[in-house]
């Protein structure tokens, strides 16, 4: 990853940075005004953080961007596999209806310039997609539950059906998230991945010391992408 700001508050990817028509970023915890559990750069409205803090953090984010951002859209995620297209039909809705439409979404898609689609993650995997031919972007929240439900491949299918996206035209970036070494799971989670059709020899290991399984969410989502290694960045 590369730094997009002087003090590393925002991170990014070389593979996306070469496309001046698209803005992207990965935030860190630093440089915001939130405190306590939300310290300090919390931009999510779906927390107990104050609206003032969230708005000021988002304003600072806009100032850091090299693009003119009209509005930031963050879904109220549910660890599912539903996605929403942010388009002219969405903009025609009332503010209350927009909030309702964002509820339960774990991926946002848009091809409308000036609008930023986001997801929020901690351990879960953020996946950024850019179709450099159709000029469509997507932000995907792939927690283990969403990964089991094949959220990334579902979003790719959605992009193909709605915009004609082809895998070879997509830049895919996997963001900071829990590693194979750290993601210890119980048998029920292991079984959920196996029952969902994943080749467990590719995405899991069993530690001799603990007898516990570990799952590689990065690899699980990578193999869901019809994208070559040359287009994929983690």
PLM regions: where:
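Active-site microenvironment for binding and transforming phosphate-containing groups
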Residues: 1-232
């Amino acid at each position: 990853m590369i730094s997009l700001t002087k003090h590393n508050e925002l991170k990014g990817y070389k593979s996306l940075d070469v496309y001046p028509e698209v803005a992207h970023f990965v935030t860190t915890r630093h440089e915001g005004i939130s405190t306590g559990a939300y310290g300090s750069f919390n931009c999510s409205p779906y927390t107990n953080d104050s609206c003032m803090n969230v708005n000021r953090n988002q304003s600072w984010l806009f100032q850091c961007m090299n693009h003119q951002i009209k509005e930031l859209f963050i879904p109220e995620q549910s660890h599912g596999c539903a996605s929403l297209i942010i388009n002219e039909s969405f903009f025609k809705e009332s503010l209350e209806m927009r909030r309702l439409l964002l509820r339960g979404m774990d991926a946002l898609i848009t091809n409308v310039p000036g609008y930023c689609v986001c997801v929020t993650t901690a351990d879960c995997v953020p996946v950024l997609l850019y179709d450099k031919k159709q000029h469509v972007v997507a932000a995907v929240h792939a927690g283990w539950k969403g990964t089991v439900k094949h959220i990334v491949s579902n979003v790719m299918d959605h992009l193909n059906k709605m915009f004609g996206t082809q895998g070879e035209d997509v830049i895919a970036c996997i963001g900071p998230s829990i590693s194979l070494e750290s993601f210890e799971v119980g048998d029920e989670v292991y079984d959920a991945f196996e029952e969902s059709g994943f080749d467990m020899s590719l995405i899991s290991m069993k530690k001799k010391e603990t007898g516990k399984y570990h799952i590689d969410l990065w690899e699980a989502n990578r193999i869901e992408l019809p994208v070559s290694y040359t287009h994929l960045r983690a």
